[in-house]
Amino acid sequence: MIAPAVLRALRKNKTLRYGVPMLLLVVGGSFGLREFSQIRYDAVTIKIDPELEKKLKVNKITLESEYEKIKDSTFENWKNIRGPRPWEDPQLLQGRNPETLKPKTT
């Protein structure tokens, strides 16, 4: 059994009290991060099914295809409705009030 004087001396040693736990944290964190970063490299090496790959290539969305979809849309008939503030009644501002639903007269 270790003498009480030796235990007291070990408790007062700052290297053992602060340095060893810090060293364990750094080394343990390094191994932990290595495991998490390995997941990224494992995910890259996984090959997907060729049928699924063909399906993904067929459904590829490009900027030009999205532009063609909205090119003929009309954006003239919309109304800007302000959202309610925390102290205001949302029923009045979200278009449920008949006065706000009246069309503009030009």
UniProtKB/Swiss-Prot annotation:
It comes from the Eukaryota. It is found in: Mitochondrion inner membrane. GO terms for cellular component: mitochondrial inner membrane; mitochondrion. Residues 81-106 are annotated as: Disordered. The chain crosses the membrane at residues 16-33. Keywords: Membrane, Mitochondrion, Mitochondrion inner membrane, Transmembrane, Transmembrane helix. InterPro entries: Cyt_c_Oxase_assmbl_COX16. Residues 1-15 are mitochondrial matrix. It is a single-pass membrane protein. Its main location: mitochondrion. One of its GO terms (biological process) is mitochondrial cytochrome c oxidase assembly. Residues 34-106 are mitochondrial intermembrane. Belongs to the COX16 family. Associates with the MITRAC complex. Interacts with MT-CO2/COX; specifically interacts with newly synthesized MT-CO2/COX. Interacts with SCO1, SCO2 and COA6. Required for the assembly of the mitochondrial respiratory chain complex IV (CIV), also known as cytochrome c oxidase. Promotes the insertion of copper into the active site of cytochrome c oxidase subunit II (MT-CO2/COX2). Interacts specifically with newly synthesized MT-CO2/COX and its copper center-forming metallochaperones SCO1, SCO2 and COA6. Probably facilitates MT-CO2/COX2 association with the MITRAC assembly intermediate containing MT-CO1/COX1, thereby participating in merging the MT-CO1/COX1 and MT-CO2/COX2 assembly lines. This is Cytochrome c oxidase assembly protein COX16 homolog, mitochondrial. The gene is Cox16.
